[in-house]
Amino acid sequence: YGNNTVLSDVSLSVKPGEIHALLGENGAGKSTLMNILFGMPVIHSTGGFGGTIEFNGTPVNIENPHKAMELGIGMVHQEFMLIPGFTVAENVKLGREISSQTVASSIFGKSLERLDKPAMAEDTRVALNTIGLGVEDYARVAGMPVGYMQFIEIAREIDKTGIKLLIFDEPTAVLTESEAERLLE
């Protein structure tokens, strides 16, 4: 960050199926490392970083979150990225909506397709079942307990296809003890 070195001599190797945890005090650089791996703009706007990132044995330049997602990297952020007025399914499928063709879209293009809400709900239910969250896919996120919102964030990442590395930034910070235990199972 600016002229301050936040991380130095960091080396991390993760193999498929492994789970790793970074431990350290507040300000130790855990979130900074995760932001580097996900190409978050804050890294580049505060001076960038030196070094290399290898993914699947190949050096990569993760310049933004879109590039990270193309590589198969997903991230559950410390701050919620949900839209309160949307349903659970709309949040889980945001940016990856399933649509179906209409008469108008067949003439004027894809932008006039209709959301296939049953298909979106079905995908969402699979992700919610995977993490054991018994919330309705059509429920609005606004007003839900923060633990539910954290699990919805996780469901969104699980629902993505091609995920090879899933990064969690303090996933249990807002969870109750029983919710944290369920997540870690």
Which positions does each model-derived feature cover?
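Glycine-rich phosphate-binding loops of nucleotide-dependent enzymes
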Residues: Y1-E185
